[in-house]
Curated annotation (Swiss-Prot):
This is AP-1 complex subunit beta-1. SMART domains: Alpha_adaptinC2, ARM, B2-adapt-app_C. Keywords: Acetylation, Cytoplasmic vesicle, Golgi apparatus, Membrane, Nitration, Protein transport, Transport. GO terms for biological process: basolateral protein secretion; determination of left/right symmetry; heart development; intracellular protein transport; kidney development; melanosome assembly; platelet dense granule organization; vesicle-mediated transport. Belongs to the adaptor complexes large subunit family. It is found in: Cytoplasmic vesicle, Clathrin-coated vesicle membrane; Golgi apparatus. Subunit of clathrin-associated adaptor protein complex 1 that plays a role in protein sorting in the late-Golgi/trans-Golgi network (TGN) and/or endosomes. The AP complexes mediate both the recruitment of clathrin to membranes and the recognition of sorting signals within the cytosolic tails of transmembrane cargo molecules. Adaptor protein complex 1 (AP-1) is a heterotetramer composed of two large adaptins (gamma-type subunit AP1G1 and beta-type subunit AP1B1), a medium adaptin (mu-type subunit AP1M1 or AP1M2) and a small adaptin (sigma-type subunit AP1S1 or AP1S2 or AP1S3). The modification N6-acetyllysine is found at K318. Residues 584-621 are annotated as: Disordered. It comes from Mus musculus. The gene is Ap1b1.
């Protein structure tokens, strides 16, 4: 008979019967009784009253009965800690049993009983099991150490178990090695500062030897451990890669992904000129392709990981486009992921093939998939310039189908194509206008309105078209209302005599009849601009917009590097670092790739890609910065925790492109009516000077100005939150960067009459993802008139949202009295990283590659420094002089710097000896940064 019979009873008074049976002299009856107890426990009945009777059954030679009793013990020991001590003697005895299965069972159960009271009794049996002659017992004991460490870390360290665990890495049995590595990794993860896994070439060699012989899960533990090792040079990295490569052909997909992670990390250290590098690239493709023949759930995980790999090294899969073509029976989540990878791999060589596929997808029945396919065609046009004409033609064919949702998506993406290729495809506007009546989705209506407003001079009846939208103004979404307001103002500036009545009508609707503050604000801005200075209004509203970037929503480079280190884990599926979704007090280690060798810089790497925004795949409307209370009130400001504050899991980290073209100009972007766009018509950064190109090609002959480091400039503390606004709490502070770490140096003063305790701090989302790296620790209560100084470490892995101004930081501080809010501006130079020195050839190539429109020129006045002093001072704040020369008595410093999010800024600083005015020319793919970089230059040089 099967064990199902134990689950069918519903008798009353069963506990008493079970008690009698458990104390029976007959072994069979006793075993039956224990089975009934376990069955009752499994279905949720409380059988804890039988604890002493069940524990008495431990004294048996029957392995099955012993397992059942141990199962009961694990479940009820926490609720009956005093009774659990009764079992200790049996554990000690079982750990010396001649049967290794019983010894292992005892030590496994010991680790699972999470009761502090009995842990010290278990140390001696565990010590014996760690040195047991049987490898099965040793491997079980290794895992037990990690479990015991979780309950009482200090006890494990005092008893020397960690050293024993390290010794097991040299064990002769590969499974013991794997479990020891797994246990040490688990402990090291929860205690990042412990430096437990201090690997060296000898121990790495032992791990690689064990790798070939242990089970698949043991291999995963070892591979994950190898991924945390930093080889001393490229030769060692290559040696490890050679020994890990055979794992790529393993049947278990988890082993394959762990091997890919190791290879992706160590490839950073290999020179691209090596034959082995090319061989490795070829070997990586087949296993990744094989993963796509698994069941859909595994395919999805594989595709999310491949998405990261393709962003980091597109060359691995550039010839494998066909495997990402969608199959008719793929689930929607697999289809959408494949579509995204197809766009990432699209190039001039395969674009015809890709477009043919996308056009076919656009005729499918799944509406969501069709929409994505139409958007993908637009993204291809923006990414591969040579295909733009064919893409536009394909989109027009789709518009002719008159399928409503296809037409609407096509109009949205054509608007982006107009932005990317101005004055090239405007001939299709007439076709678009024919479909005005069928548009019912806000995004499509807003896109069409933008097109009409932007090209009003080419559309004869533009005023009639916009007037038709105006009739139902109050019924439109905010996105459409904002876009309509801007479009009519553009039309008025282009045809003032014919549209005066129309512009007055829309301004009246926006400012007097609307309850929406964003709409009212924008209406008032336009009204004042038009009434005070129509010429300025024209310069602002009709300013030339920067081109949108050809990069399609790449993950920000530093985040991408971190996610590559988490291939095969949940982080690689969410595309978020673990600290964004893992709760609890464990320390979070931020992993990063090893530094690249000089010749391994990938030309296709996002590191060197323009810092552009998503062009085709539209981000959601960015929420308003609003008043400071808005977002900050929703932040979790609970008591301090031992780990860094966690970002809300709903925030898509890394998905917001910070400074790229998609956000450059809110006029005409997909984010129509984003509330933060109340100054949507802000002019594009003007070109403030002619491009300084003369003599740049001589850079190879120049000598580099290298200065000595004297520490990054630190501004004096300023009052950020006066006491009168914070119920007696005054907060002053400044920002510093020392040895690569950013800190917020705070001074808290209690000017109230009561003691202040329970401090906590949280930042709102901001342009560079600044976030506290640790809780705000005020170790003693802050008494009246007492001041305390705190250095709060910061990191840049928080949630990203473009702020206005760019360096605006909104902060919430909580104590036992209330929650207080303030905002401050952080100096951009604290974000300048230490590896911001570009080599000369790269500098020259990048300078030429960045469009002249992105160049800005500034004057720095009243600066008494000579050239060498200026260079040294700037270098101490991570602005590096790449080259220096003298032209007609004028010193020219060519400099580079890099921000924490991977954006490079190139500079030319002209210094005329004896003249206190310097001329600074800046070039950057994200022009919004230039003004703040200039301010950093001025601050550093003048202080």
């Amino acid at each position: 008979m099967t064990d199902s019979k134990y689950f069918t009873t519903t008798k009353k008074g069963e506990i008493f019967e079970l008690k009698a049976e458990l104390n029976s002299d007959k072994k069979e009856k006793k075993k039956e009784a224990v089975k009934k107890v376990i069955a009752s426990m499994t279905v949720g009945k409380d059988v804890s009253a039988l604890f002493p009777d069940v524990v008495n059954c431990m004294q048996t030679d029957n392995l099955e009965l012993k397992k059942l009793v141990y199962l009961y013990l694990m479940n009820y020991a926490k609720s009956q800690p005093d009774m659990a001590i009764m079992a200790v003697n049996t554990f000690v005895k079982d750990c010396e049993d001649p049967n290794p299965l019983i010894r292992a069972l005892a030590v496994r159960t010991m680790g699972c009983i999470r009761v502090d009271k009995i842990t010290e009794y278990l140390c001696e049996p565990l010590r014996k099991c760690l040195k047991d002659e049987d490898p099965y017992v040793r491997k079980t004991a290794a895992v037990c150490v990690a479990k015991l460490h979780d309950i009482n870390a200090q006890l494990v360290e005092d008893q020397g178990f960690l050293d024993t665990l390290k010794d097991l890495i040299s064990d002769s049995n590969p499974m013991v090695v794997a479990n020891a590595v797994a246990a040490l990794s688990e402990i090291a993860e929860s205690h990042p500062s412990s430096n437990l896994l201090d690997l060296n070439p000898q121990s790495i060699n032992k791990l690689l030897t064990a790798l070939n012989e242990c089970t698949e899960w043991g291999q995963i533990f070892i591979l994950d451990c190898l991924a945390n090792y930093m080889p001393k040079d490229d030769r060692e990295a290559q040696s490890i890669c050679e020994r890990v490569t055979p794992r790529l052909s393993h049947a278990n997909s988890a082993v394959v992904l762990s091997a890919v992670k190791v290879l992706m990390k160590f490839m950073e250290m290999l020179s691209k000129d090596l034959d082995y590098y090319a061989t490795l690239l070829k070997k990586l493709a087949p296993p990744l392709v094989t993963l796509l023949s698994a069941e859909p759930e595994l395919q999805y995980v594989a595709l999310r990981n491949i998405n990261l790999i393709v962003q980091k090294r597109p060359e691995i899969l550039k010839h494998e486009m066909k495997v990402f073509f969608v199959k008719y029976n793929d689930p929607i989540y697999v289809k959408l992921e494949k579509l995204d990878i197809m766009i990432r791999l699209a190039s001039q060589a395969n674009i015809a093939q890709v477009l043919a596929e996308l056009k076919e997808y656009a005729t499918e029945v799944d509406v969501d998939f069709v929409r994505k396919a139409v958007r993908a065609i637009g993204r291809c046009a923006i990414k591969v310039e040579q295909s733009a004409e064919r893409c536009v033609s394909t989109l027009l064919d789709l518009i002719q189908t008159k399928v409503n949702y296809v037409v609407q998506e096509a109009i949205v993406v054509i608007k982006d194509i107009f932005r990317k290729y101005p004055n090239k495809y405007e001939s299709v506007i007439a076709t678009l206008c024919e479909n005005l009546d069928s548009l019912d989705e806000p995004e499509a209506r807003a896109a069409m309105i933008w097109i009409v407003g932007e090209y009003a001079e080419r559309i004869d009846n533009a005023d009639e078209l916009l007037e038709s939208f105006l009739e139902g103004f109050h019924d439109e979404s905010t996105q459409v209302q904002l876009q309509l307001l801007t479009a009519i103002v553009k039309l008025f500036l282009k045809k003032p005599t014919e549209t005066q009545e129309l512009v007055q009508q829309v301004l009246s609707l926006a400012t007097q009849d609307s309850d929406n503050p964003d709409l009212r604000d924008r209406g008032y801005i336009y009204w004042r601009l038009l009434s005070t200075d129509p010429v300025a209004a024209k310069e602002v509203v009709l300013a030339e917009k920067p081109l949108i970037s050809e990069e399609t929503d790449l993950i920000e480079p530093t985040l991408l590097d971190e996610l590559i280190c988490y291939i095969g884990t949940l982080a690689s599926v969410y595309h978020k670092p673990p600290n964004a979704f893992v709760e609890g007090g464990r320390g979070v280690v931020h992993k990063s790739l090893p530094p690249r060798t000089a010749s391994s810089e990938s030309t296709e790497s996002p590191e060197t890609a323009p810092a552009g925004a998503p062009a085709g795949d539209q981000p959601d409307v960015i929420p308003a910065q609003g008043d400071l209370l808005g977002d900050l009130l929703n932040l979790d400001l609970g008591p301090p925790v031992s780990g860094p504050p966690l970002a809300a899991s709903s925030v898509q980290m890394g998905a917001v492109d910070l400074l790229g073209g998609g956000l450059d100009s809110l006029i005409g972007d997909s984010n129509f009516g984003a509330p933060s766009a109340s100054v949507a018509a802000a002019p594009a950064p003007a070109r403030l000077g002619a491009p300084i190109s003369s003599g740049l090609s001589d850079l190879f002959d120049l000598t580099s100005g290298v200065g000595t480091l004297s520490g990054s400039y630190v501004a004096p503390k300023a009052v950020w939150l006066p006491a009168m606004k914070a119920k007696g709490l005054e907060i002053s502070g400044t920002f510093t960067r020392q040895a690569g770490s950013i800190s917020m140096d705070l001074q808290l003063t209690n000017k109230a009459l009561q003691v202040m305790t329970d401090f906590a701090i949280q930042f709102n989302r901001n342009s560079f993802g600044l976030a506290p790296a640790a809780p705000l620790q005020v170790h003693v209560p802050l008494s009246p008139n007492q001041t305390v100084e705190i250095s709060l470490p910061l990191n840049t892995v928080g949630s990203v949202l473009k702020m206005e101004p760019l360096n605006n930081l909104q902060v919430a501080v909580k104590n036992n009295i209330d929650v207080f809010y303030f905002s401050t501006l952080y100096p951009l130079h604290v974000l300048f990283v230490e590896d911001g020195k570009m080599d000369r050839q790269m500098f020259l190539a990048t300078w030429k590659d960045i469009a002249n429109e992105n160049e800005a020129q500034f004057q720095i006045r009243d600066c008494p420094l000579n050239t060498e002093a200026a260079s040294n001072k700037l270098q101490s704040s991570n602005i590096f002089t790449v080259a220096k020369r003298n032209v007609e008595g004028q010193d020219m410093l060519y400099q580079s710097l890099k921000l924490t999010n991977g954006i490079w800024v190139l500079a030319e600083l002209r210094i005329q000896p004896g003249n206190p005015s310097f001329t600074l020319s800046l070039k950057c793919r994200a022009p919004e940064v230039s003004q703040h970089v200039y301010q950093a230059y001025e601050t550093i040089l003048k202080n």
